């Protein structure tokens, strides 16, 4: 149990964090097993925060990465993102479900998910060396002005977004990069990347594919149409940013 002083500190931080408009991944479910995420508006204030499979950050305001920071380390795993030393298993072809602490209904946009293979220990990762490939995305689902988006799917599912790990990738250590994009301010997209350490275990198919990838700092350009998109107009399609999705 926390000492009284530390408990009061955390209680105060939680109270203050309620005013923050955005969120973070607070719970992680790998093949149905629950793990805690990095509580970005609480753990940085604790002298000894718990270890999590979610990467620690200093995003105490639950804020975003703006397009002018696309080539900076902030876009990799958010501001102050550093590798966690621990991980958790999920099977190839298995399910990952990520729960957000909160998310504004007005913040419509796509959800993008990437993986990067890790050689060596997680704690020794150089974030800029990670090569990400996209394996899941949900952009515009239906409608327009503003339409129904990947973020709306997440909200409708109790702030949870589900994805499937490709069944053919090689087993081993990976960083999962999960990202929400908010388009409510036209021409000023907001990105919310979150990183999680997973260890993919082999399944009966015995997959051994290594898709390669791209550094996160090279995934996007501020001029990409998907970041300049006006969600308050009539439209019937949306150009999702980033790579094509890797398919089994």
Curated annotation (Swiss-Prot):
Gene coding for it: LPMO9G
Biotechnology: Lignocellulose is the most abundant polymeric composite on Earth and is a recalcitrant but promising renewable substrate for industrial biotechnology applications. Together with cellobiose dehydrogenases (CDHs) an enzymatic system capable of oxidative cellulose cleavage is formed, which increases the efficiency of cellulases and put LPMOs at focus of biofuel research.
Stated role: Lytic polysaccharide monooxygenase (LPMO) that depolymerizes crystalline and amorphous polysaccharides via the oxidation of scissile alpha- or beta-(1-4)-glycosidic bonds, yielding C1 or C4 oxidation products. Catalysis by LPMOs requires the reduction of the active-site copper from Cu(II) to Cu(I) by a reducing agent and H(2)O(2) or O(2) as a cosubstrate.
Glycosylation sites: 58, 203
Gene3D superfamilies assigned: 2.70.50.70
Signal peptide start-end: 1-21
Disulphides: 77-195
The protein, known as: AA9 family lytic polysaccharide monooxygenase G
Record bears the keyword Disulfide bond: yes
Recorded GO MF terms: metal ion binding; monooxygenase activity
Binding site for O2: 190
Similarity remark: Belongs to the polysaccharide monooxygenase AA9 family.
Annotated Gene Ontology cellular component terms: extracellular region
Cofactor: Cu(2+)
Domain of life: Eukaryota
Subcellular location: Secreted
Catalytic activity, reaction form: [(1->4)-beta-D-glucosyl]n+m + reduced acceptor + O2 = 4-dehydro-beta-D-glucosyl-[(1->4)-beta-D-glucosyl]n-1 + [(1->4)-beta-D-glucosyl]m + acceptor + H2O
Cofactor note: Binds 1 copper ion per subunit.
Keyword annotations of the record: Carbohydrate metabolism, Cellulose degradation, Copper, Disulfide bond, Glycoprotein, Metal-binding, Monooxygenase, Oxidoreductase, Polysaccharide degradation, Secreted, Signal
List of residues binding Cu(2+): 22, 107, 192
Keyword presence, GTP-binding: no
């Amino acid at each position: 149990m926390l000492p009284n002083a530390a408990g009061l500190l955390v209680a105060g931080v939680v109270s203050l964090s309620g005013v923050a408009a955005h969120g973070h991944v607070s719970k992680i479910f790998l093949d149905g097993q629950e793990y805690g995420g990095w509580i970005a508006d609480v753990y940085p204030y604790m002298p000894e925060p718990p270890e999590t499979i979610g990467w620690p950050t200093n995003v105490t305001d639950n804020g975003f990465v703006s397009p002018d920071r696309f080539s900076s380390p902030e876009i990799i795993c958010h501001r102050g993102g550093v590798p966690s030393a621990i991980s958790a298993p999920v099977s190839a072809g298995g399910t990952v479900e990520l729960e957000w602490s909160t998310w504004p209904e007005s913040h419509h946009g796509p959800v993008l998910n990437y993986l990067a293979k890790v050689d060596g220990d997680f704690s020794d990762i150089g974030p800029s060396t990670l090569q990400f490939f996209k394996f899941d995305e949900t952009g515009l689902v239906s409608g327009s002005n503003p339409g129904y988006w990947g973020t709306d799917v997440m909200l409708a599912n109790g702030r949870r977004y589900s994805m499937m790990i490709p069944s053919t990738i090689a087993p081993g250590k990976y960083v999962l990069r999960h990202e929400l994009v908010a388009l409510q301010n036209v021409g000023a997209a907001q990105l919310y990347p979150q990183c999680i350490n997973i260890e993919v275990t082999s399944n009966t198919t015995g997959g051994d594919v290594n898709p390669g990838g791209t550094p996160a700092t090279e995934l996007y350009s501020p001029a990409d149409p998907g970041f300049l998109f006006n969600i308050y107009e009539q439209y019937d399609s949306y150009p999702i940013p980033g790579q094509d999705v890797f398919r089994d």
